[in-house]
Amino acid sequence: MRRLLLSALCALPVMAALPVLALAEEIKPAIVFDMGGKFDKSFNESVHNGAQAFTKETSIEVREFEPQNDTQREQALRNLARRGQTPIVAVGFNQASALKTVSAEFPKLHFVILDTVVEAPNVQSIVFREEQGSYLAGMLAALRSGTGKVGFVGGMDVPLIRKFACGYGQGARAANPKAEVFQNMTGSTPTAWNDPVRGAELTRSQIERGADVIFQAAGATGLGVLQAAADAGKYGIGVDSNQNHLHPGHVLTSMVKRLDVAVQKAFQEAREGRFTPGTRVLGLEDDGISLAFDDNNAKIVTAEMRAKVDQARQDIVAGKIKVHDYMTDNSCPN
């Protein structure tokens, strides 16, 4: 009898662990990337890095799909759902319509969408306060500029990208009320995210007008912006991931969105049975948004510049500085 009792007690820790192990085995995460692919050195790649970190930590593989055209998004989401993948991450606002359709078809599965909101009982939407980080980027650009003229190159002309541009302009004028801010959008279709040649052309045009710092929020198109700025001896500003290393000494900073952390956290919560539908908003206050400072830009960002930007960050978090969000009313001050 005593031997049986000891055997039962020894088995308890193993039995207690079984639900967790089963849950870890049940999760089958997947990602459908946006146009530009998972190695765009920007938005998609940050998501991919988060998935890689999750796999490294848990040994759970993440199935990935890179669409080559607009029509493949819904098909990819549906195919992954039919395979029982869950949670499925849809990368980018362009997937909102497709995700709304597919999530309704598979109500027992979990979905995550980045950069827009889809209201459904099985969807978690993760959005960012891009206007806050763009404001800081604009401040730094104006502080660094020798001409008082700075530029912005966006990808697809949509409210989200105008949100970046609006925050950038507000920050630039906060640092220098006389600053001129040039703005160009690459196009009106998703191909605008993957046209570095056009990005370079728009950058050179702004440089010819006197801009010496250009911020890009344009996916793979932005790589052309950074290249053109570096070639001309000017400064670019990276976006989404830390792009400072692409042209050391010529990328003033990068406005980083911690998409990697957001995705890794979403997968981990699902694995632990804590998936929560609804909207999650990340900004400066929780380090969901930040500027990148490292050895690659240390020599071009002075201590005085850094101090002013750091103070502005604190003031935004404290509510002393209110950065207007373009998407609240589709307008921008100034």
Where are these regions (language model features)?
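Positively charged n-region of N-terminal signal peptides that target proteins for export
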Residues: M1-L4
